[in-house]
A protein has these predicted regions:
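Radical SAM [4Fe-4S] cluster-binding motif and immediate context
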Residues: 1-152, 164
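Short, charged/polar, Gly/Pro-enriched secondary-structure boundary elements
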Residues: 203, 289-294, 343-349
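Short amphipathic alpha-helical interface segments
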Residues: 278-317
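A short, conserved structural fragment
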Residues: 320-336
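Short glycine/proline-centered loop/turn elements that form peptide/ligand docking sites
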Residues: 162, 317-318, 322
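A structural motif corresponding to the C-terminal lobe/cap of the Radical SAM core domain
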Residues: 88-90, 97-272
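Short, amphipathic alpha-helical interaction segments positioned at domain boundaries
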Residues: 334-370
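Short, ordered beta-strand-loop transition motifs
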Residues: 272-280, 331-333
Length: 370
């Protein structure tokens, strides 16, 4: 602040950076195959220390966001913070990286602690591809999380990643029908190939993953002198491995074009439910799947509850079948996954998973090891 001046800090700096932990608690369990985090051993500050620091920052800089520098926020962070601080108004608006939450109430807790910008580890909506990545989440959980976060007014920034050893065309082909249906959901910031990083399992376990002919990026030849051991200095590598997406350039180009359209037309898309009284609800629908033509649906409360609640396909009703016909939900991992957004209070009232015992969905960590 002293270097740039108080005026610059007051007018131009919107966010402060804060560290509450180091390492990655998920990597301690099952490191994602593309993750290049070098340090190991997750450790974190005590919650009372974090709370004390946040209170100080809020008091000293009341108009600033606080962005956590943590690679991943501590497991159960929001609930623990709420338990320690009933009055969430004392907290500044927060930003953080985190693992996808399975349940709606967990996203509601994020909203309650003033989380405004989050970077969730989405990466894909294909559970098979997520298992290849060792992500510890599923396609249905990722999509459900994005729908819930957007309904709660939380901005998400995420990426979709392609190009993994052994991947198949069908692990990407589904995006051709999914993207037009979710054009109202905030799009990914990146649609990019997985990179081979030195400290990632894709490098450290290259042989076991079927990756051969590892070589450092040629740009290192322009950075270091000839005598330098560039293979030891480099962090970025290339390698050969079987991958159907690399063998399907026409599909990749089509998906890239769809993602661009998603980004360009997201703001004109909507799929939103609101109450109009007397147990009736109006759905406004303008998405890519309908050519951005506005459609309206009037539904009664029982149907609205079914539409808004994730449900195993074996337990689905005629209401779910109707919702699928209208593309108000999709089927992922043999689950009906709702796509319709709503204001947070209405969502919490209609989504029955918010009032029932939390849904016991199988985790990718479980299915990976089965």
């Amino acid at each position: 602040m002293a270097i740039l001046g108080e005026d610059f800090f007051r007018e131009q700096v919107r966010a402060l950076w804060y560290e509450s932990n180091r390492g990655c608690w998920w990597a301690d369990k099952s490191k994602c195959t593309f993750c290049g985090i070098a340090e190991g051993g997750f450790r974190h500050k005590p919650m009372d220390r974090v709370l004390e620091d946040l209170r100080w920052l809020q008091g000293r800089f009341p108009d600033k966001y606080v962005f956590f520098t943590d690679l991943i926020i501590n497991e159960g962070f929001a609930g623990k913070l709420l338990a320690a601080l009933p009055d969430t108004e004392a907290l500044p608006p927060l930003g953080m990286q985190l693992k996808v939450f399975r349940e709606l109430h967990e996203v509601a807790e994020l909203r309650a602690i003033q989380a405004r910008v989050i970077l969730p580890g989405i990466e894909s909506f294909s559970t098979r591809l997520l298992k290849r990545m060792r992500k510890g989440t599923t396609g249905k959980q990722n999509l459900y999380f994005l729908r819930n976060a957007q309904s709660m007014g939380i901005q998400t920034q995420y990426a979709l990643i392609w190009g993994f050893p052994g991947d198949t065309r069908e692990e990407y082909d589904y995006l051709r029908w999914l993207i037009p249906k979710i054009s109202h959901i905030r799009p990914p910031r990146e649609f990019e190939a997985a990179q081979l990083l030195r400290d990632a399992p894709m490098y450290q376990e290259a042989g076991a993953l079927g990756i051969t002919n590892l070589a450092y990026w040629k740009v290192y030849d322009m950075v270091y002198p000839e005598w330098a051991d560039k293979a030891s200095l480099a962090n970025y590598f290339v390698g050969d491995f079987p991958s159907e997406i690399y063998q399907a350039p026409e599909l990749l180009q089509e998906l890239e074009a769809l993602v661009v359209q998603w980004r360009n037309h997201h703001r004109q898309s909507c799929l939103h439910m609101q109450s109009i009284g007397n147990g009736q609800y109006l759905i406004e629908d303008r998405r890519m799947v309908h050519g951005y033509e506005m459609r309206h649906h009037l539904v009664q409360e029982p149907r609205a509850q079914h539409i808004m609640t994730p449900t195993r396909m074996a337990a689905c009703t005629e209401d779910h079948a109707w919702a699928l016909e209208q593309a108000l939900g999709v089927v992922l991992d043999d689950w009906y996954v709702p796509l319709v957004l709503a204001q947070s209070d209405l969502l919490l009232m209609l989504d029955q998973s918010a009032t029932e015992v939390p849904i016991q969905q199988e985790t990718a960590f479980d299915t990976m090891n089965s």
